[in-house]
């Protein structure tokens, strides 16, 4: 059987991981899958026919080391998503290129160094009662803050410490995240697989399971699919997998993020999605 490494990290105890649901569908198609940490320096990546980035959910702590490891793996075997796409997606400034191509997005201020006055002015700039600030290289909502005019001063010292010399982004807080939820569209080999809605727990804005978010399988509306397909077409190259996070914004849908590195694909919520992934992978590898 061909060997595929599902790239992960050393410790997943605090995370919900569903990639084991891929093992049997992949085996049915001639692939022996095993989970391997990107931090393991003893691995000979050339023994694998394919490496798929999956649950590397600590890469944001050492992004330079992560990039070096991806580059090393890419020299030894086939890496998916493609290295060029992973590097493009690792910094959220990729959203700028999507904006140029007309993808509907949440308005964003991009900062290289932290300026508290700019943060305060952003409430007026965006005509928003709340803001979200986060690093441009981040995952799992790490170092992400939901701010209001009333609590900014309380967070000032922590914000200055967190973002002093760290590229970051400021966006208006989108109330639909807490009032309705954030939707995720999952694409395997360019085809829509399934859609879920993620809602945060009470008094929170983070939709991840690890932060108490609730998840449910839903159907996509035609407009949601249109935005998803428009976003896919705006990517620099094809992807084996993609998760497009969208939210209702000003009577339409806006893209929050496009996850091409290590998105949870929530195979647990759709029992046939692991089979769809394995089948899409088979066709994708043949044509790319």
Residue ranges and their predicted role:
Residues 48-53, 184-187, 252-264:
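A short beta-strand motif that forms the metal-chelation/ATP-contact edge
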Residues 148-232, 236, 247:
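Phosphate-binding site of ATP-dependent enzymes
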Residues 10-112:
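Conserved N-proximal alpha/beta basic substrate-recognition cap immediately N-terminal to
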Residues 10, 56, 136, 173-174, ...:
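Anionic group-transfer/hydrolysis microenvironments
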Residues 131, 186, 194, 242, ...:
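Protein kinase-like catalytic core scaffold
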Residues 138, 190, 249-252:
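Short strand-connecting beta-turns/loops that link adjacent beta-strands
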Residues 2-8, 70-76, 84-180, 222-226:
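Active-site nucleotide/adenylate-binding loops and adjacent lid/helix of ATP-dependent enzymes
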Residues 222-288:
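ATP-dependent carboxylate activation and anion-phosphoryl transfer catalytic cores
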């Amino acid at each position: 059987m061909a060997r595929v490494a599902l790239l992960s990290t050393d410790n997943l105890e605090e995370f919900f991981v569903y990639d084991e649901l891929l093992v049997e569908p992949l085996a049915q198609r001639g692939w022996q899958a095993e989970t391997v940490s990107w931090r393991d320096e003893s691995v000979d990546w050339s023994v694998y026919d394919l490496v798929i980035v999956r649950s590397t959910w600590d890469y944001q702590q050492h992004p330079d080391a992560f990039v070096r490891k991806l580059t090393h793996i890419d020299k030894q075997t086939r890496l998916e998503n493609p290295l060029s796409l992973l590097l493009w997606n690792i910094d959220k400034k990729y959203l700028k290129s999507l904006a140029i191509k007309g993808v509907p997005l949440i308005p964003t201020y991009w900062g290289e160094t932290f300026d508290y006055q700019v943060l305060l002015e952003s409430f007026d700039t965006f005509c928003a009662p709340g803001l979200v600030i986060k690093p441009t290289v981040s995952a799992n909502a790490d170092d992400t803050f939901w701010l209001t005019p009333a609590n900014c001063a309380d967070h000032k010292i922590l914000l200055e410490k967190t973002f002093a010399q760290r590229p970051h982004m400021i966006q208006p807080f989108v109330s639909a995240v807490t009032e309705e939820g954030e939707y995720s569209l999952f694409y395997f080999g360019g085809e829509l697989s399934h859609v879920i809605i993620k809602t945060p727990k009470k008094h929170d804005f983070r939709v991840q399971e690890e932060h108490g978010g609730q998840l449910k399988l839903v159907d996509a509306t035609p407009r949601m699919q249109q935005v998803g397909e428009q976003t896919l077409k705006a990517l620099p190259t094809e992807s084996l997998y993609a998760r497009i996070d969208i939210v209702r914004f000003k009577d339409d849908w806006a893209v929050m993020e496009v996850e091409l590195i290590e998105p949870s694909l929530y195979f647990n919520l759709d029992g046939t999605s692991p089979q769809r992934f394995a089948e899409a992978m088979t066709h994708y590898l043949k044509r790319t």
